UniProtKB/Swiss-Prot annotation:
Gene responsible for this protein: RTN4R
GO molecular function per UniProt: chondroitin sulfate binding; ganglioside GM1 binding; ganglioside GT1b binding; heparin binding; neuregulin receptor activity; signaling receptor activity
An annotated GO cellular component: perikaryon
Keywords: Cell membrane, Cell projection, Disease variant, Disulfide bond, Glycoprotein, GPI-anchor, Leucine-rich repeat, Lipid-binding, Lipoprotein, Membrane, Receptor, Repeat, Schizophrenia, Signal
Compartment(s) where it occurs, according to its Swiss-Prot or TrEMBL record: Cell membrane; Membrane raft; Cell projection, Dendrite; Cell projection, Axon
Glycosylation sites: N82, N179
Effect of R377W: In SCZD; associated with disease susceptibility; unable to mediate down-regulation of axonal growth; does not affect interaction with MAG, RTN4, OMG, NGFR and LINGO1
Subunit structure: Homodimer. Interacts with MAG. Interacts with RTN4. Interacts with NGFR. Interacts with LINGO1. Interacts with KIAA0319L. Interacts with OLFM1; this inhibits interaction with LINGO1 and NGFR. Interacts with OMG.
Positions of the propeptide segment: 448-473
Name recorded for this polypeptide: Reticulon-4 receptor
Biased composition annotated in UniProt, kind: Gly residues: 434-445
Claim: Magnesium is one of the keywords in the record: no
Residues carrying lipid (GPI-anchor amidated serine): S447
Domain of life where this protein originates: Eukaryota
Length: 473
């Protein structure tokens, strides 16, 4: 019995020694290998120029960061079937073969960040990594995301793509990432957010898009983001944001929109109304235009502050000059179109209210102020705001040539003022007519002259005429 137990102890010791030898014996010269807390091969900052040969097959963690590795060949880690963490960040990687990570079905964390020469990744590189939950591709100089790059990464929760040179978000790029909770896209060159950019991200909690060049967001871009709690869009080129894009964000708690060239005119009314109802935490939304509202927070304005339209008259240039954009401007919004609003609110910036600008001086028929009409009219006559009531001359008094409503002559025959018994006596009427030097026209000659003559004579003159005609009594 004792002999059997002694044999078992020797066998157990032999197995333990064999396992230790498998880890320690083949450890590459520049690396340190240890078993606790997990089987680890650690080779950071050793000046390595290639992936070392002879990494223990039992390794669960491999640290190769901070070296001079420029290429990851195919099947470099195929023997490491138990690998869960692989760090290759802060190297000089310029190429990763499509099959570099083949066989790593248990891999959970892959860090490729800080490899500025990488620039592109083969779409098949991450295929087969079904358990991967964290992927670092930040600061890799990436210029595009190839089709199908993240296909099959159903377990991915954290995706770091910040500080690259990405210019676009292709449709359905993240479609398979149904469990993704954090997406970092800040610090790129993205100019627009298309409709299908974030399709399939039903679990997304945090979306960071700040410090890009975003000028347009499609109204349905955030349709699948019902669980999103944090959205950063600050430091972009946004002058307007459709509230249709914000409507699906029912769980949103943190919103940052500052450092954008917001135009606070009639186009901002829907966003203003949405912000009034938003109960989460939001940054200021400083206005860029019109000039009278520059620097003021859109959230703190009144609805009647958002009047008129700031319309560029010359060649288009981006409003915010901090970052150039190749995007073309959209057409006039509905509230700025002539059939939706008075043309007086669609004006050229910088043009004063004067008789030389017929558009500003025009007052539509039936648009007179209530009451007796004696007060000055407040007309939003430029994209830079409403003129005060004390402006001289009042806009309602400006009637430049050609601004009268059609169908009414601008000048006509002048009618001679007549006499009215309401305000004149009979004698005053006679004297006034005689003093006017006029009398009648040619129609008063002949038989019709006597009544006109008698109307214009004094009582003494009338008596003399009657005496001459009838003779002395």
């Amino acid at each position: 019995m004792k002999r059997a137990s002694a044999g078992g102890s020797r066998l157990l010791a032999w197995v333990l020694w064999l396992q230790a030898w498998q880890v320690a014996a083949p450890c590459p010269g520049a690396c340190v290998c240890y078993n606790e807390p997990k089987v680890t091969t650690s080779c950071p900052q050793q000046g390595l120029q290639a992936v070392p040969v002879g990494i223990p097959a039992a390794s669960q963690r491999i640290f190769l960061h901070g070296n001079r590795i420029s290429h990851v060949p195919a099947a470099s880690f195929r023997a490491c079937r138990n690998l869960t963490i692989l760090w290759l960040h802060s190297n000089v990687l310029a190429r990763i073969d499509a099959a570099a990570f083949t066989g790593l079905a248990l891999l959970e964390q892959l860090d490729l960040s800080d490899n500025a020469q990488l620039r592109s990744v083969d779409p098949a590189t991450f295929h087969g990594l079904g358990r991967l939950h964290t992927l670092h591709l930040d600061r890799c100089g990436l210029q595009e995301l190839g089709p199908g790059l993240f296909r099959g990464l159903a377990a991915l929760q954290y995706l770091y793509l910040q500080d690259n040179a990405l210019q676009a978000l292709p449709d359905d790029t993240f479609r398979d990432l149904g469990n993704l909770t954090h997406l970092f896209l800040h610090g790129n060159r993205i100019s627009s957010v298309p409709e299908r950019a974030f399709r399939g991200l039903h679990s997304l909690d945090r979306l960071l898009l700040h410090q890009n060049r975003v000028a347009h967001v499609h109204p349905h871009a955030f349709r699948d983001l019902g669980r999103l709690m944090t959205l950063y869009l600050f430091a972009n080129n946004l002058s307007a944001l459709p509230t249709e894009a914000l409507a699906p964000l029912r769980a949103l708690q943190y919103l940052r929109l500052n450092d954008n060239p917001w135009v606070c005119d009639c186009r901002a009314r829907p966003l203003w109304a949405w912000l009034q109802k938003f109960r989460g935490s939001s940054s200021e939304v400083p206005c860029s235009l019109p000039q009278r509202l520059a620097g003021r927070d859109l959230k703190r304005l009144a609805a009647n502050d958002l009047q008129g339209c700031a319309v560029a008259t010359g060649p288009y240039h981006p409003i915010w000059t901090g970052r150039a954009t190749d995007e073309e401007p959209l057409g006039l919004p509905k509230c700025c179109q002539p059939d939706a609003a008075d043309k007086a609110s669609v004006l050229e910036p910088g043009r004063p209210a004067s008789a030389g600008n017929a558009l500003k001086g025009r007052v539509p028929p039936g648009d007179s102020p209530p009451g007796n009409g004696s007060g000055p009219r407040h007309i939003n006559d430029s994209p830079f705001g409403t003129l005060p009531g004390s402006a001289e001359p009042p806009l309602t008094a400006v009637r430049p040539e050609g601004s009268e409503p059609p169908g009414f002559p601008t000048s006509g025959p002048r009618r001679r003022p007549g006499c009215s018994r309401k305000n004149r006596t009979r004698s005053h009427c006679r004297l006034g007519q005689a003093g006017s030097g006029g009398g009648g026209t040619g129609d008063s000659e002949g038989s019709g002259a006597l009544p006109s003559l008698t109307c214009s004579l004094t009582p003494l003159g009338l008596a003399l005429v009657l005496w001459t005609v009838l003779g002395p009594c």
